[in-house]
Amino acid sequence: VFEMDMNKLNPNSHAHVNSTLARQLALYVTMYSPLQMAADLPENYERFMDAFQFIKDVALDWDDSRYLEAEPGRYITAARKAKGTNDWFIGCTSSEQGHASTLKLDFLDADKQYIATVYADAKDADYKTNPQAYVIRKGIVSPKTVLKLKAAPGGGYAISIMEVKDKAELKGLKKLSGNI
């Protein structure tokens, strides 16, 4: 769901989806289901096609699942390896308190090269006041990479980590590390 304000669909409603757009992407990873769907109106996705790319890329089934951090009722960060590939997807969802993560990508294969695309809450994102604020960062990652990310209140982040198939994919990209 990319449209959080239900008043736009039903003017008499004051309902609100308690989530940021980045958190909605993360749910594709944190909540396992081999039957995924895009549950919003097509025109709402069309407004955010850069973020919709994550939904197009995310796998439906997994060879490996790892829970990188969690505190019940506060946050969860899961990493899942797409079945039959070397591609990984990470999702973090947080409560209304938000969450700061330090992610070590040491589960990646040291013999492979990867490109990560991070879909994260923007600095001013908030599930109540600015749920559609997000940033996208893309760069090269390895098992030595450490990323620091902040999930806004009611927010999260999603990361696709794709194995490099052709060195040309690396052109113009820099290493991702530190604060995202």
Question: Which residues are covered by each model-predicted region?
Answer:
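Glycan-recognition surfaces
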Residues: 1-42, 69-70, 120
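Flexible loop/turn segments at secondary-structure boundaries
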Residues: 3-7, 37-39, 46-48, 97-100, ...
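Conserved, mostly hydrophobic/aromatic
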Residues: 30, 90, 154
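Acidic/polar loop patches that form or flank catalytic/metal-binding clefts of enzymes
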Residues: 34-45, 64-66, 102, 115
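Glycan-recognition and catalytic regions of carbohydrate-active enzymes
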Residues: 43-89, 124-130
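Carbohydrate-binding surface patches
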Residues: 72-115, 119, 157-160
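Solvent-exposed beta-strand/loop surfaces of large extracellular or lumenal domains
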Residues: 118-144
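C-terminal beta-strand-rich structural cap/linker in extracellular carbohydrate-active enzymes
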Residues: 138-180
